[in-house]
Structure formats: structure tokens, C-alpha cells
């Protein structure tokens, strides 16, 4: 699906939302205000905001058996996707040593943003560049890495190109984040 069709699918899926996504220089740009809906069905600190995955999947549909969730703490187990998280027995900085390379077409990542966040999770801060290399190894050529973070991680332009940048905020007193979507070259 080309990028404009992804945008159109998003706007058709959410017709009441403002049309805040657009295409510029072969890159989806936009802003999402998620709102103050606190019905996320988990007590886990830092879980995806309510509606986040529905919005993402309107742009990049779940690919059964070809989707990986990194830092997947609150997601239920499913036969449709695999998970890497400190509570699954896979380490985010070494998982490509176990998972076969060129396996996934879609990877969604929501890493801890800071040392303070890691204190809440009970884990250590990750090295984003190492996790990126691990994701590169298991992602198929042409596959997509959707990275939700407060920073743009270091990446190699010979390995990835950015195809989307979407700012995201929940509501007042919440951090701004950015959804950066990479395509593996």
C-alpha cells in the first residue's frame, strides 16, 4: 500500500478525527491528540495510550505471524504477533541472536524513554542504537519499524529511511512523543 493510501485508510477509519495526516516529500507527517481517555485495560506504567494501536493499524495493518512487538509489557499473548520484553525471556539488545533474521514485516516498539521510566518498569535503560540493529536484523527488506519515543534514535540511512513522523500527546500534563516509522532498505 502506498503512503497516500495509508493516509486515506486512516482518515476513512476515523472520519470524526481531524484530518491531521498528510504526505510531504514521500513522508507521512502529522499530529495526534489522543485525549484523556483512561480506559486502557492495564495497570502497567507506560502502556500504549487508549486507541494508539487502532490508529497505527489503520496506517499499517497487523500482519499475522509477521508482526513483532518490542517492549510489549501490557499486550496480551496472541498467535497473531510475537513479543520481546524483559518478562518474555527475550532481551531487547540480543533478541536477533535467537530470532531468525529477515522474519518480520512489521515491528512496533515503545521503549522506556528515560532512566526514571526504567525505575517504574524494574529494568535497565536500553541502548537504542543496539536495539535498532537487532530490529534491522529480524526485519525483512521493505518492512516497517514503528518507533514510539521522545527522541529520534540514531539510525543508518543505508539501512532505513523515515517514511512517517507523527507527533503524539495524550492530554494535559502528559509528555509529547513522536511516532517515527522507518522502512528497511
Regions found by a protein language model. Give the residues of each.
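Class I S-adenosyl-L-methionine-dependent methyltransferase catalytic core
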Residues: 1-185
Amino acid at each position: 500500500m502506498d503512503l497516500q493510501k495509508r493516509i486515506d485508510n486512516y482518515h476513512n477509519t476515523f472520519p470524526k478525527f481531524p484530518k491531521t495526516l498528510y504526505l510531504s516529500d514521500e513522508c507521512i507527517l502529522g499530529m495526534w491528540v489522543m485525549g484523556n481517555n483512561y480506559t486502557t485495560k492495564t495497570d502497567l506504567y507506560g502502556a500504549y495510550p487508549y486507541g494508539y494501536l487502532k490508529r497505527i493499524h489503520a496506517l499499517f495493518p497487523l500482519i499475522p505471524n509477521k508482526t513483532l512487538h518490542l517492549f510489549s509489557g501490557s499486550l496480551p499473548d496472541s498467535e497473531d504477533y510475537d513479543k520481546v520484553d524483559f518478562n518474555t525471556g527475550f532481551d531487547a539488545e540480543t533478541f536477533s541472536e535467537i530470532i531468525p533474521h529477515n522474519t518480520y514485516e512489521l515491528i512496533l516498539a515503545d521503549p522506556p524513554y528515560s532512566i526514571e521510566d526504567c525505575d517504574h518498569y524494574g529494568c535497565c535503560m536500553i541502548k537504542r542504537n543496539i536495539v535498532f540493529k537487532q530490529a534491522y536484523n529480524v526485519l525483512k527488506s521493505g518492512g516497517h519499524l514503528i518507533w514510539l519515543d521522545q527522541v529520534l534514535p540514531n539510525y543508518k540511512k543505508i539501512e532505513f529511511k523515515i517514511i512517517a513522523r507523527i507527533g503524539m500527546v495524550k492530554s494535559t500534563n502528559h509528555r509529547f512523543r513522536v511516532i517515527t516509522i522507518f522502512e528497511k532498505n
